[in-house]
Amino acid sequence: MILEKNNIIHPNDLKIINDLIIDKKISFVFQNNSVPIFKKKDFYFEHCIIERKEKINDKDRYKSIHCQNFLRVFSHVFSKFKIKEAEIYRAAINLTVNNSAKKCPIHYDHNYEHKQILIYLNDSDKNAKTVILNKKNKKLKEITPKKNKGILFDYLPHYHYFPKTGYRLVMVITFKEKEK
């Protein structure tokens, strides 16, 4: 399953997020490689909102001082995708730039079943696409970044191209949908 929705974040919340980023109230941390298990030197910058479930105990997972703003955004985004309740495994804003790498390696965000939502927070280089593959690494969908577009997909391998110009801002939410 792969679903796309435009205008996924409420305009007021999108303005709050953009203001936080533009006014430098959100810090980004240098990450040496986009997919740690590959040790490829394709750096990016990350603002961690909720740390990976497998990395740290539950009480210390909320990393962003703006977490409450983001939790409200997540709730709205989940409702747009008709997700009633979810356990979030990780949430972050990834900032990628031209780093001399063409693309990140094919990967899953976790080594266990999860769903994933990507939200483009800016109109970046149109060639900085996200590519979602099937379990045999055959292309299922190629998504062009567009500000405020959200993509929901199942536990599938994927990768993205790094922008050649400008920067690419993507909010990443991995989660498990709770039983109804």
Residue ranges and their predicted role:
Residues R61-K180:
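Catalytic core of non-heme Fe(II) oxygenases with the double-stranded beta-helix
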